């Protein structure tokens, strides 16, 4: 799978808009680090650290929404972080979408890697 919106989230959005099926969005979205593509279920290539980090987002504009905080991930082993999956729960829940890192970041145990920015875009938009 390429990075992107999960089947779960796509179906929830479409059912909500087109079928009037209620969808309750999560109060908080959580980020999980990965050493490669998280895959269709969001669970592949997971970092050795199981923690998911709370994310905050600015208001959507022009079909995009951007992260407004900077979660920090402390490595517990030597690894390279290449992507992030986003979830609706800190430990269980549903996989929402994944994003590829602009550049993979490598480090050793104790090093900190930050998510400086993440933007989810729905498009193309009608012009």
Where in the sequence are the language-model features?
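Small cysteine-rich, disulfide-bonded extracellular modules of the LU/uPAR three-finger superfamily
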Residues: 1-84, 88-127
């Amino acid at each position: 799978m390429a990075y992107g919106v999960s089947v779960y989230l796509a179906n929830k959005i479409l059912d909500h808009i087109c079928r009037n099926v209620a969808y309750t969005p999560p109060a908080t979205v959580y980020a999980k680090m990965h050493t490669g593509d998280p895959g269709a279920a969001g669970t592949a290539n997971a970092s050795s650290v199981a923690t998911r980090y709370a994310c905050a987002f600015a208001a959507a504009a022009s079909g995009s929404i951007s992260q407004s905080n900077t979660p920090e991930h402390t490595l517990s082993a030597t690894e390279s972080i290449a992507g992030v999956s986003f979830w609706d729960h800190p430990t269980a829940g549903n996989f929402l979408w994944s994003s590829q890192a602009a550049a993979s970041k490598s480090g050793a145990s104790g090093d900190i890697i930050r998510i400086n920015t993440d933007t989810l875009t729905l498009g193309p938009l009608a012009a």
